């Protein structure tokens, strides 16, 4: 290991030059790596949800959908709004009140139940559905969501997963650099105070930052990464690999005490000692991240590969780039040395060792409450609830819930296209009786037998009924 250290010491300037040059392709790779904002994409392909999405695309030419709430607009203007939305690229179809019965049919002659699906007479809100020709998080769908907002001059509220994904993308792109910067500043402040040099944290951040950029840039070869991975990777890599840099610095100081007149020899020894200690530690860390790769929910694979790669690059940077920085700016580091503020923990350490049985008893006693807490902690699965209320999608979900019978989310059921009207109504009635369901409807149940299906436009029927399947909607 010491031989490797001597090579690094000898080639420190070329290493620094190369490390800066590698930032160029890494930055290009980072900006050209596609980010996936659809959590559903990472579900196994054989589950019903993903099979249903494939059927929607193959049989109906639809992937994503959104519910649009229009507040305080008369029917004529809503119809004009729908026409605008239909003209947006990648909007496959729009299902609205006017599209079903036309503008000339008085709403008073229609069943109250049917009208309630599209109108709230008390608040003046109107509801219609948009279907897109691509999947929930595709670039085309997100672009279409934004264009719908633009053509309607923000007069409508777009709810649904595609709107959530679009707003999540905007928010993540805006906030990720900010909290990474906050993490770096906080780490620098803590290290500058508790270490013996004000300058060394800067070189820690430079070497770790380069490794992070290499990691994020090399994601280009993975094709795409999830927005969760992109948001977490930098901060996680910083936290996981920072200890390696601290270990190298302390090892270098100890080696300098033995060879005070030869700092290059001291660094070679420090690199060797760091490699010996850090490799074992990093392997266990890498193994932990690789374990995520075996999840059937493949977000684990996405995060595991990126973080395992980040740890390896962090170790390499710690024993190549960081030593090169330290030796190159050794005199500047010496000038910024100060007395360590961190107190000596020798006495507490000896006391803990001498009274270890006390801590054993304490932790055994804490095990029971810990297990109870783990088993009784409530887990939420709705990511949209974690988003700020000021986002467009959050406001839209609230409008949807306030105006249409507590509706929060709308889902689709794909049923047999040849299902009779009687069986369809019976199925929807059973679904409506389930806890947490606001409403469930199919074409037959929406009409309620009072309006013949034949009265509906063929274009509408074909949107909801195919050769093998028909679309039913369920709201929770």
Locate predicted features.
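Membrane-embedded transmembrane helical bundles of large multi-pass transporters/channels
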Residues: 1-35, 41, 136-381
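Generic intrinsically disordered, low-complexity segments enriched for polar/acidic and small residues
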Residues: 27, 39, 57, 111-115, ...
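Surface-exposed, low-hydrophobicity interaction/linker segments
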Residues: 35-38, 102-104
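Structured non-transmembrane domains adjacent to transmembrane bundles in polytopic membrane proteins
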Residues: 45-162, 378, 384-476
């Amino acid at each position: 290991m010491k031989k490797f250290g001597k090579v690094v010491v000898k080639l420190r300037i070329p290493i620094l030059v190369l490390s800066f040059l590698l930032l160029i392709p890494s930055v290009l790779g980072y900006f050209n790596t596609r980010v996936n904002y659809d959590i559903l994409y990472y579900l196994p392909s054989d589950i019903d949800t993903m099979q249903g999405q494939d059927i929607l695309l193959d049989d109906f030419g639809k992937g994503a959908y959104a519910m649009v709430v229009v507040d305080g607009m008369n029917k004529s203007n809503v119809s004009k709004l729908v026409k605008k939305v239909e003209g947006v690229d990648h909007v496959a179809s729009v299902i609205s009140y006017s599209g079903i019965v036309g503008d000339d049919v008085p709403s008073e002659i229609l069943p109250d139940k049917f009208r309630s699906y599209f109108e709230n007479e008390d608040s003046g809100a109107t509801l219609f559905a948009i279907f897109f020709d691509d999947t929930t998080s595709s670039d085309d769908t997100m672009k279409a969501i934004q264009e719908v907002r633009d053509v309607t001059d923000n007069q409508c509220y777009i709810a649904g997963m595609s709107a959530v994904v679009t707003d999540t993308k905007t928010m993540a792109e805006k906030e990720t650099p900010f909290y990474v910067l906050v993490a770096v500043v906080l780490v620098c402040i803590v290290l500058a105070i508790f270490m013996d040099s004000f300058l060394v944290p800067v070189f820690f951040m430079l070497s770790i930052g380069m490794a992070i950029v290499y990691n994020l840039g090399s994601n280009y070869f993975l094709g795409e990464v999830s927005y969760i991975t992109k948001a977490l990777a930098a901060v996680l890599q910083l936290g996981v690999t920072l200890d390696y840099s601290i270990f190298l610095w302390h090892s270098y100081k100890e080696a300098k005490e033995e060879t005070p007149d030869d700092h290059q020899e001291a660094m070679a020894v420090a690199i060797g000692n760091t490699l010996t200690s850090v490799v074992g530690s990093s392997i266990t860390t890498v193994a932990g991240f690789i374990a995520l790769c075996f999840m059937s929910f493949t977000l684990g694979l996405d995060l595991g590969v990126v973080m395992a790669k980040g740890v390896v690059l962090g170790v390499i940077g710690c024993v190549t780039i960081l030593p090169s920085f330290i030796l190159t700016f050794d005199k500047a580091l010496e000038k910024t040395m100060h007395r360590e503020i961190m107190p000596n923990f020798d006495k507490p350490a000896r006391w803990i060792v001498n009274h270890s049985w006390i801590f054993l008893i304490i932790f055994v006693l804490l095990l029971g409450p810990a297990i109870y807490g783990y088993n009784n902690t409530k887990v939420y699965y709705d990511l949209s609830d974690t988003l700020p209320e000021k986002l467009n999608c959050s406001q839209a979900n609230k409008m949807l819930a306030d105006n249409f019978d507590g509706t929060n989310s709308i889902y689709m059921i794909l049923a047999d296209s040849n299902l009779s009207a009687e069986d369809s109504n019976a199925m929807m009635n059973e679904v409506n009786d389930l806890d947490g369901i606001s409403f469930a409807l199919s074409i037959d149940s929406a009409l309620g037998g009072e309006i013949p299906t034949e009265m509906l436009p063929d274009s509408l029927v074909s949107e909801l009924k195919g050769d093998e399947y028909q679309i039913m909607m369920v709201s929770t």
